[in-house]
């Protein structure tokens, strides 16, 4: 690893040491509970002019005076952010998951037969969605950096909802495949945007719980979708039954998209915060050393992303993890194949969501009380997916209920994925690097999801055992990748501690370094959480 050199600042004054457990900026917290912020850059006008280009937009409200705020003020701002920002993210994440899995409910009500979808074409409904998702990643990352996130999300949410609605008007595979492709393009904007939002609004130690919170709405969506699917199956209207899930879910999503017209672009522009609270919101994320938002794209940071070992391991993990994701589309069909009717099979997917949400809650509690151990936690929750896979595969057909429970256990994989996703917001610094890593991460997410449904072939019906076996192999492989990632973080933190111990001058104070849009590899004081 000697060729993985770090670029550290040449300027060093007031040298100080840093450890894996303490960020140097934490020394600003005083005994009376107030928090003192060091002075800003002295050439204020030049900084404000460059904030819109080279540096972070947070500098626009950081003046040259000492700024202090109390712990109670910090908590008040956090509660406001939780009240105004987090629910919108949670519901949106649930809606996008509900939208993309609507085909699962339509399938058990005759869509495959009435729209003339052979087994391989149905698999392509999932594959082509993620082809669109993959194509969208780098353009979405670029647009996310250039335009207000509120309008970006409104347009994306409105257009993917429209695609879901229009699927009810289709009568053949060509229309369905086309709309699934464009639905994937627009839904592909959500994950990169939400990772960026989490890093923008929350402290590093707060991020895992918030990522788990909005990611948990995948599980909520599974439960809501099961009820909607069950309900729409009883509609006696003039349309074919399989079209109603698209109409109901698409209409709800379209209405929800308009919420983003009122969504703040960043803490500096948040209307629900007063001037002092905006400054506190900015200072809250100073210790993260990951910045807030910068509009200028920096190619050097993008290049660094492709050379960073942690990025390589994270994207490899994500690709392997998503190989298991076809279960979201095939779960109702697998349960139907175990021996339950279409309507009952749809209803029996509801506990899958409950298991996923329970896993998320447990993960959130763990990360709240234990500041380290995100990767071991993800490895532990993923082991439940291994158990579920073996139950579906090995338990005799004469014993259907344990096999259904295996399907439910399989879905706990999402809680581990959410925990690893929080590493993106915590361990990647430099805004251009961040959007590049997010795009690359979800490009591999797309590749895994493109491969996944092709492993569930028509010849495997009704139980898709070979697809389950392939998923099992994938989980075992990414467990190994996670072990390597944990080792890398521990090694790199120790190496930086040693560098500071041997060269104390490297730890010198650089005013507002946290908002100078430096990458994690350019900051010797940066420590990786694992």
Curated annotation (Swiss-Prot):
Gene3D superfamilies: MFS general substrate transporter like domains. Belongs to the major facilitator superfamily. Allantoate permease family. Residues 24-33 have a biased composition (Basic and acidic residues). InterPro entries: MFS (IPR011701), MFS_dom (IPR020846), MFS_trans_sf (IPR036259). It comes from the Eukaryota. One of its GO terms (cellular component) is membrane. Keywords: Endoplasmic reticulum, Membrane, Transmembrane, Transmembrane helix, Transport. Its main location: endoplasmic reticulum. It comes from Schizosaccharomyces pombe (strain 972 / ATCC 24843) (Fission yeast). One of its GO terms (molecular function) is transmembrane transporter activity. One of its GO terms (biological process) is transmembrane transport. This is Uncharacterized transporter C460.05. The keyword Repeat does not apply. The chain crosses the membrane at residues 83-103, 124-144, 147-167, 181-201, 211-231, 244-264, 323-343, 346-366, 375-395, 404-424, 436-456, 471-491. SUPFAM superfamilies: MFS general substrate transporter (SSF103473). Signal peptide: none annotated. Residues 1-33 are annotated as: Disordered. It is a multi-pass membrane protein. It holds the Pfam family MFS_1. It is found in: Endoplasmic reticulum; Membrane.
């Amino acid at each position: 690893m000697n060729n993985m050199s770090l670029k550290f600042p040449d300027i060093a004054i007031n040298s100080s040491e840093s450890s894996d457990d303490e960020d140097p900026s934490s020394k600003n917290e005083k005994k009376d509970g107030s928090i003192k912020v060091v002075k800003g850059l002295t050439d204020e006008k030049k900084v404000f002019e460059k904030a819109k280009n080279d540096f972070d937009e947070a500098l626009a409200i950081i003046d040259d005076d000492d700024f202090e705020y109390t712990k109670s003020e910090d908590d008040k701002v956090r509660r406001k952010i939780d009240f105004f920002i987090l629910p919108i993210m949670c519901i949106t994440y649930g809606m996008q998951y509900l939208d993309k899995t609507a085909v699962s409910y339509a399938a058990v009500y005759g869509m495959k037969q009435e729209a003339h979808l052979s087994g391989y074409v149905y698999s392509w409904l999932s594959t082509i969605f993620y082809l669109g998702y993959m194509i969208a990643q780098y353009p979405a990352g670029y647009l996310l950096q250039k335009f207000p996130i509120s309008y970006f999300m409104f347009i994306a949410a409105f257009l993917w909802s429209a695609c879901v609605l229009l699927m009810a008007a289709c009568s053949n595979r060509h229309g369905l495949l086309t709309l699934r492709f464009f639905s994937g393009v627009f839904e592909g904007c959500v994950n990169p945007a939400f990772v960026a939002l989490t890093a923008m609004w929350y402290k590093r130690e707060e991020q895992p719980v918030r990522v788990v919170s909005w990611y948990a709405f995948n599980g909520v969506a599974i439960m809501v979708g099961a009820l909607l699917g069950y309900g729409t199956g009883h509609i006696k209207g003039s349309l074919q039954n399989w079209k109603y899930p698209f109409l109901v879910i698409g209409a709800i999503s379209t209405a929800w998209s308009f919420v983003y017209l009122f969504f703040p672009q960043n803490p500096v522009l948040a209307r629900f915060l007063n001037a002092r609270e905006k400054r506190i919101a900015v200072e809250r994320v100073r210790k993260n050393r990951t910045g807030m938002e910068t509009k200028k794209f920096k190619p050097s940071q993008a290049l660094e992303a492709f050379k960073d070992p942690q990025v390589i391991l994270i994207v490899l993990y994500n690709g392997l993890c998503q190989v298991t994701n076809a279960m979201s589309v095939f779960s109702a069909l697998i349960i139907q194949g175990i021996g339950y009717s279409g309507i009952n099979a749809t209803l029996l997917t509801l506990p899958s969501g409950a298991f996923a949400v329970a896993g998320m809650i447990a993960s959130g509690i763990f990360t709240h009380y234990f500041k380290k151990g995100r990767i071991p936690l993800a490895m532990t929750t993923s082991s439940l997916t291994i158990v579920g896979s073996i139950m579906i595969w090995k338990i005799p057909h004469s014993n259907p209920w344990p096999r259904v429970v295996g399907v439910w256990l399989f879905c706990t994989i999402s809680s581990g994925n959410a925990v690893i996703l929080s590493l993106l917001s915590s361990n990647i610094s430099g805004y251009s690097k961040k959007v590049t890593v997010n795009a690359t991460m979800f490009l591999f997410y797309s590749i895994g999801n493109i491969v996944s449904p092709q492993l569930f072939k028509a010849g495997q019906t009704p139980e898709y055992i070979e697809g389950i076996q392939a998923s099992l192999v994938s989980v075992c492989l990414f467990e190994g990748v996670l072990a390597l990632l944990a080792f890398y973080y521990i090694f790199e933190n120790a190496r930086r501690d040693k560098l500071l111990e041997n060269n104390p001058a490297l730890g010198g104070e650089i005013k507002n370094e946290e908002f100078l849009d430096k990458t994690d590899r350019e900051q010797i004081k940066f420590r990786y959480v694992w």
